[in-house]
């Protein structure tokens, strides 16, 4: 015998889950951008301190600048991937 197909559960519950995941993603993105900004500020401060003679070790300045450069490149690449995924979704036919 064939079993009866049960109805779907309430739709409002899935909306709550989606809202929660949206908040998690937006919060994670915000925190990541704040970290990149902090790294950029730290590199800029190290360069200023070196220029004013407060830091004598150029290696520290170069390391901070490279960290900032890598963080920025990674951020740009993540943004590019997000935009690409959004465009792919927008091109999908329903």
UniProtKB/Swiss-Prot annotation:
It is found in: Bacterial flagellum basal body. It comes from the Bacteria. HAMAP family: FliE. Signal peptide: none annotated. NCBIfam families: fliE. InterPro entries: FliE. GO terms for biological process: bacterial-type flagellum assembly; bacterial-type flagellum-dependent cell motility. Belongs to the FliE family. Disulfide bonds: none annotated. PANTHER family: FLAGELLAR HOOK-BASAL BODY COMPLEX PROTEIN FLIE, PTHR34653. Keywords: Bacterial flagellum. GO terms for cellular component: bacterial-type flagellum basal body. Pfam families: FliE. This is Flagellar hook-basal body complex protein FliE. GO terms for molecular function: cytoskeletal motor activity; structural molecule activity. Residues 1-26 are annotated as: Disordered.
